[in-house]
């Protein structure tokens, strides 16, 4: 017995660390990437394909599609994309390579369209099929322009190589530690709810004890929640592009994201007003019961649940009904008539905030039970607001830049014959197309692109020198495969957390492809290695010049577009635009993207303090979004008996709201916020006077509790919207965007 007891801990020590290591997403993805690369290389060598490097490169790019979904559709579309690109390349090179006036414009259109459809969202549900059209056309043209007589054999070789890589990646993604976007969304949603629960708890406690200030941890929670929303936004885009199941239920996922954002912002409303202790004391027990029920509901929603399992019931609705009954009882005692107007409005505002928390928690419960889960029958999909695809002008520009880079590269190959010809068009096209993902993944887009290109050139020179020194050791097949596996493992380990490809990750991918293409298992001349890396450098130079001089992707410009988009959608919401679901979804996503972009504005004119102010402005806009949304949803609920008094004041306020929105938009459009903003004090004071008139006349005395609640809640929403707008104006006035809003930092 003693020996067994002593042996058990040893076994556990050997077993559990291994299990823990394999549960790490970085290690899993590193292994998967290594396996996909080796499988593609093995099949290419087994089939005696001409250039195995194209198979390995295709596998690397395709492994960026992390999630399992509709494997049959993916396989068919990737095969069709590859074959279609090959036929297009064969047709262009075979018939028109000797007629540049036809060949180059047609080639430009094909590659441009492929790049555009790869990035277009949400219309492109099979993006990698379009990518493979462009990649295969480019690969056939790369080799075919110098040997058009053999274009059919070249097209067949490139087709088989790219199909090898595409199918290898699809096989590994599906069979080895498969990832499901719907399951990861559910887990990330629970994590975001846990973060929101901490803030709700803080603000509920502050409301109960009658204070407006909250602990300093609230700021950190706000930042953590922004990070959680960023993860969910990236999952929305990736899942919609890679999984037909996820895409079919996109409206449900969008609604979950909107409710989650509203829930978080409703918590901030709780401590916006300080309620008199004398009034809070009358409903103390009921408010505490509601707070306990909210905490219980969060515990239920954030707990792990098996797919198909019903959520446990909670006491939230019963607790709030008891609270509502107690408030009605206090109202009948005419406590609010004797209290000052500000006190009454503050209490009813808190009541409305608690009710909004209840409604959003109920909505999230309903949405959570309706989310598709693995192994369960799929719920009926809801219609999505984006029925028809729209033109995405950003990706039109990206496609044109990619097409222009590819054309310049082909012209160089045809008439100048530079070193490393196989790498030039590929490097130029991919670096030109992937501009926006650089920003999403933590890069700066085309900002400082010449500096980055210079540093990358130095890194490529170092890689060439290292490869010249190590080539003799890679002649052994086993050593070569082990080296490739560990390189791919290292690459996957360090890139899996990024939401997209960065500039450096893409350069690394193409360098790995060049390494495989040199085939170090056989003696490789130093000049061949140098020529191959020179080709990468030339292609990078073409992409850098085109990307930086033609529609450059700059974080400050993306931020400008996001801010203008937020303001225009808020104005549309105030104006009664019928497409509310679309507007709400955009208003939930755009601020998250804006916060991502703010972190990437790194230049001398934008200091740390300036970035902090920009982040504060985006968060103020998020608060404005929440207040405006609630205002629009409630303004038609104004009791008819109060409408003749309040409606004219509300309409005047809305006109002034739109004026401030126009001024803010003009500031960001012109790149200069050094101006005065209109004041809302007079219009808000007129609303308060109208409310006082209603109070003195006591026209709501004989109405149900819902009448004063709706009236004062709506009044408070107008006040909150006005305060949020003035806060946005105050923050905008302190910005110095004229120093960095333009095209700087080459």
Q: Locations of the language-model features?
A:
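Composition- and surface-driven signal marking solvent-exposed, interaction-prone regions
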Residues: 249-252, 256, 277-279, 283, ...
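Long, low-complexity, intrinsically disordered cytosolic termini of multi-pass membrane proteins
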Residues: 233-236, 587-628, 661, 671, ...
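Soluble C-terminal extramembrane regulatory/interaction domains of multi-pass membrane proteins
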Residues: 195-196, 200-210, 253-375, 620-746
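A transmembrane helix-and-boundary motif of multi-pass membrane transporters/channels
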Residues: 1-237, 241, 248, 355, ...
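Acidic, serine/threonine- and proline-rich low-complexity regulatory regions
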Residues: 242-254, 601-617, 639, 703-710
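Secondary-structure capping and boundary motifs in well-ordered enzyme cores
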Residues: 80, 84, 130, 252-259, ...
């Amino acid at each position: 017995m003693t020996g067994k007891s002593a042996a058990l801990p040893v076994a556990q020590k050997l077993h559990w660390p291994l299990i823990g290591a394999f549960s790490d997403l970085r290690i899993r993805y590193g292994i998967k990437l290594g396996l996909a690369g080796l499988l593609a290389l093995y099949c290419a060598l087994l089939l005696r394909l001409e250039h195995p490097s194209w198979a390995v490169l295709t596998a690397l790019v395709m492994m960026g599609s992390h999630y399992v979904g509709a494997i049959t559709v993916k396989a068919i579309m990737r095969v069709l994309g590859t074959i279609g690109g090959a036929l297009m390349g064969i047709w262009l090179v075979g018939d028109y390579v000797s007629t540049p006036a036809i060949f180059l414009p047609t080639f430009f259109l094909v590659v441009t369209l492929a790049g555009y459809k790869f990035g277009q969202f949400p219309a492109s549900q099979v993006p990698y099929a379009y990518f493979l059209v462009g990649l295969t056309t480019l690969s056939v043209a790369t080799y075919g322009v110098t040997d058009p007589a053999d274009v059919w054999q070249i097209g067949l070789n490139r087709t088989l190589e790219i199909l090898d890589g595409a199918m290898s990646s699809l096989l590994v993604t599906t069979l080895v530690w498969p990832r499901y976007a719907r399951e990861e969304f559910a887990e990330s949603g629970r994590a975001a709810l846990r973060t929101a629960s901490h803030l709700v708890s803080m603000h509920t406690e502050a409301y109960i004890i009658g204070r407006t200030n909250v602990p300093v941890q609230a700021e950190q929670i706000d930042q953590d929640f922004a990070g959680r929303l960023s993860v969910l936004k990236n999952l929305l885009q990736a899942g919609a592009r890679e999984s037909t199941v996820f895409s079919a239920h996109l409206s449900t996922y969008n609604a979950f994201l909107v409710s989650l954002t509203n829930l978080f912002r409703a918590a901030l409303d709780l401590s916006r007003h300080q309620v008199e202790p004398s009034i809070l004391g009358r409903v103390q027990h009921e408010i505490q019961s509601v707070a306990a029920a909210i905490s219980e509901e969060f515990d239920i929603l954030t707990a792990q649940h098996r797919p198909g399992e019903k959520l446990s019931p909670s006491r939230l609705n019963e607790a709030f009904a008891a609270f509502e009954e107690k408030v009605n009882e206090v109202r009948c005692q005419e406590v609010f008539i004797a209290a000052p107007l500000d006190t009454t409005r503050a209490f009813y505002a808190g009541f409305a905030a608690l009710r909004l928390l209840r409604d959003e928690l109920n909505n999230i419960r309903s949405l959570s039970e309706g989310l598709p889960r693995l192994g369960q029958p799929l719920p009926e999909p809801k219609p999505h607001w984006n029925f028809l695809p729209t033109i995405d002008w950003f990706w039109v520009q990206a496609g044109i830049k990619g097409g222009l880079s590819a054309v310049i590269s082909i012209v160089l190959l045809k008439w100048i014959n530079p070193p490393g010809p196989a790498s030039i068009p590929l490097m130029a096209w991919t670096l030109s197309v992937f501009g926006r993902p650089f920003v999403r993944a933590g890069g700066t887009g085309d900002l400082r692109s010449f500096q980055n290109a210079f540093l990358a050139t130095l890194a490529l020179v170092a890689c060439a020198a290292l490869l010249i020194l190590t080539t003799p050791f890679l002649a052994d097949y086993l050593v070569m495969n082990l080296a490739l596996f560990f390189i791919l493992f290292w690459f996957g380990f360090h890139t899996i957390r990024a939401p997209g490809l960065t500039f450096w990750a893409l350069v690394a991918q193409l360098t790995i492809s060049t390494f495989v293409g040199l085939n170090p298992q056989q003696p490789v001349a130093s000049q061949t290695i140098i020529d191959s890396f020179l080709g990468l450098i030339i292609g990078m130079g073409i992409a850098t010049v085109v990307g930086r001089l033609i529609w450059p992707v700059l974080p400050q410009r993306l931020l400008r577009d996001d801010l203008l988009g937020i303001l225009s959608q808020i104005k549309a919401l105030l104006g009664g635009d019928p497409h509310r679901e679309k507007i709400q979804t955009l208003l939930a996503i755009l601020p998250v993207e804006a916060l991502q972009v703010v972190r990437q504005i790194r230049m001398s004119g934008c200091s740390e303090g300036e970035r902090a102010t920009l982040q504060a402005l985006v968060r103020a806009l998020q608060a404005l979004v929440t207040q405006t949304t609630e205002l629009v949803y409630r303004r038609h609920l104004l009791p008819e008996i109060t409408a003749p008094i309040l409606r004219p004041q509300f309409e005047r306020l809305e006109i002034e709201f739109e004026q401030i929105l126009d001024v803010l938009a003009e500031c960001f459009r012109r790149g200069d916020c050094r101006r005065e903003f209109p004041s809302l004090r007079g219009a808000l004071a007129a609303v308060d006077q109208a409310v006082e008139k209603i109070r003195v006349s006591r026209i709501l005395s004989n109405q149900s509790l819902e009448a004063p609640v709706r009236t004062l809640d709506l009044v408070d929403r107008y006040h909150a919207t006005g305060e949020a707008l003035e806060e946005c104006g105050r923050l905008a006035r302190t910005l110095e965007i004229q120093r960095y809003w333009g095209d700087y930092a080459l």
